[in-house]
Curated annotation (Swiss-Prot):
GO terms for cellular component: mitochondrial matrix. Implicated in mitochondrial protein import and macromolecular assembly. May facilitate the correct folding of imported proteins. May also prevent misfolding and promote the refolding and proper assembly of unfolded polypeptides generated under stress conditions in the mitochondrial matrix. The gene is HSP60. Its main location: mitochondrion. It comes from Leishmania major. Residues 550-581 have a biased composition (Basic and acidic residues). It comes from the Eukaryota. SUPFAM superfamilies: GroEL apical domain-like (SSF52029), GroEL equatorial domain-like (SSF48592), GroEL-intermediate domain like (SSF54849). This is Chaperonin HSP60, mitochondrial. GO terms for molecular function: ATP binding; ATP-dependent protein folding chaperone. It is found in: Mitochondrion matrix. GO terms for biological process: protein refolding.
Amino acid sequence: MLSRTVPRCVKYGSTPKDIRYGMEARNALLAGVENLVKAVGVTLGPKGRNVILEMPYACPKITKDGVTVAKSIEFEDSFENLGANLVRQVAGLTNDNAGDGTTTATVLSGAIFKEGFRSVASGTNPMDLKRGIDLACREVLISLAEQSRPVTSKSEITQVAMISANMDQEIGSLIGDAMQQVGKDGVITTQEGRSLNTELELVEGMSFERGYTSPYFVTNTKAQRCELENALVYVANRKLTSVAHILPALNYAIQQKRPLLVIAEDVEGEAMHTFLYNKIQGRISGCAVKAPGFGDMRINQLQDIAVFTGSQMISEDLGLSLDQNDFSERFLGTCRKVTVSRDECILMEGGGSAIAVEERVQMIKDMISAEDHEYNRERLVERLAKLSGGVAVIKVGGASEVEINEKKDRIIDALNATRAAVSEGILAGGGTGLLMASLRLESISKDRRLPPDIRTGVNIVKKAIGLPARYIANNAGVEGSVVAGKVLARKDPSFGYNAQTGEYVNMFEAGIIDPMKVVKSAVVNACSVAGMMITTEAAVVEKDLLGREKRIEDEGMEDKEKKRSVDKLRKQVNEAGRTDAQDGAADEV
């Protein structure tokens, strides 16, 4: 039975806080930052080490992915955890923007905060220090742009993927082949295979740049994606706002015991509440996605989706309304697999007729030939690529679940790095690009026209951006400062250290390259978050009443005064519990 939502009012009570100020606050933040950076930093470079993570209710996970390590670390001390959370934010932002470079971003933010903290402790003005950090960040980006080169060949694409996958030639070749088959803007996705070997398969599919309308639709919490199998597809060229707009499709999907994908101009109000409530209650699995494009472009793209999935687009222009009496199961299409992330929807093996899809493709080709306007032609070419390009699926194989998950993490990193390289070009890898950028900051840090505290901020960034190269060398068993000194002495943006072989080489010729977008995102996010941390003067966390009670009892404090403290704490906890229960009962009423 389909259920509708009932408006509820939820009350939230305040909790006691712990506050620390000045040096005490920054010391606690720094402790959390340093411990997190130490754990993440060991994974950097081709000879970086793995980290083994305890997983609740599952076997341990072995990974070399910086953001995975960062997200798994929690500290008992709330203030230390506060600092670690800020660095985790840097890793997360970099991962969202570029899909890779999380370890570099973590190392940079930790170094900038640590040196900035020391400077503030010695009397430097924190606001001027941040201005210097921001100035240095802009100059580093200029230097990186001057060093970057476009990606022009399949071999360069393969090399970028191989480096990001920890020098795995097989993964590099698979991603190079996948991009060759579906194009640089094509869709490449991963899934767990059923054999020992990792394989590449090209399937019918299309994608568009729109994500889920609510995080409550997420089914894979680790990847933050909604994944649906054998889904029904409902396409509408209008806003769905009332229950009547979505009820017929929901009822049919529940009867068929199949998930439902809704693609419409928007899904809001009662329609969204009803869909979400029944999803949360477990009556139906599904997802709502906004339609791509605007105006006539949106109508055309919705029609492309309808043809691919075998659905009929609901549009009043076509004489089709959303009235219950007009609904028919023929309006719904099908799709073998749907993957929806925060900003992309991928449809694989739609239920549309192959003849209808081919006719649609030919129609778009004819429109491209007849179109004179460059902008319109580009949009038509995009539609053609999405409808006819297919989806490359990398099926990850392995002997165990641990091996498959570890390899899948590396493939996803390699895919993201490769896409970043294609979009914004490449730099010499191994931290060489950032070392060369530090030379640009050398002259700025000596500019006497700048206030001393701003120059100090520039110097902090100059020192920090040399650390990735040092970490890579240290993890390879070589003295990092010696390697950095030799590379800087050459002042050649293509000259660097190959940590895999222990040789100094031309990084581009050796295929040791980093995507410009990845390095840029790491620098920008690290400078932004670390700069804000330096200017922190107070830190506020919630008091742990239950934890304090346990500590007092464990220490065997038996005098009356301390027993009264325990009783008081118990009373506070019990009152808080009763208040929550009363609020919950009120909400149910």
